[in-house]
Amino acid sequence: SFPPNLYTYITINENISTDTWKVNYSKSEEVYHPIDIKNDIAREVIKHFDLPPIIMSFNCDIPTSGSGLASSSSYLIACIAAACKFKGIDYSQTEIAKLAIKLERNFNPLTGYQDPYGCALGGLKQFIFYPDYILQENLTTSIFKNYNFFLVSTGITRSSTNILKNVNFDKSYG
C-alpha cells in the first residue's frame, strides 16, 4: 500500500434549520429520510451511526470516479472518522478500516481489503490478507530518497466491481 500525500475532506454539521439530511458532493441532495440518500457512502454511514439531520459535505484532492486511486475508500474512511468525531466515538484506524469494509459491502459486495486499510493506516506498508487476520508490515521509506514518484491521473476510468467479478478470493475477514 502506498497512499500519496493527498487528502479527503468530510464535514458534518447538525442541520439546525430543517429536519432534513443534506449531502453535498459533485451533486447536492436533501432528503427527509436517510434511506433516500443516493450517495451510498453517506447513506450507509448516516444509517450506521444513526446520525440526526445533518449537513455532510465531501471534498477531495484527487479524481473520484473510477480513477483507480482509492478515492471511494478515502471518502468512506474520512466519512466514518468524521461521524465518529461528531458522535464522540473513539475508533482506532484499524476499527475504521474494518467498519469501512463492512459498510461498503452493503452497496458493493465485491469490495476488497487493500484500499480501506491503505487509506486508514497510511504510510508505506505491505499487507497480507488471510481468512481471519491481516499481517501488516511497515516498510522503509528510504526508497523515496532514491526515486521520483509521480501520481498521474490519466482521465481513464474503470469499474473495480467489474474487475473484481473475475477474481476468486476469500472475503471472510472483516
Predicted feature residues:
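A general secondary-structure junction signal
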Residues: K27, F58-C60
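Conserved catalytic cysteine-centered active-site region
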Residues: L51-S57
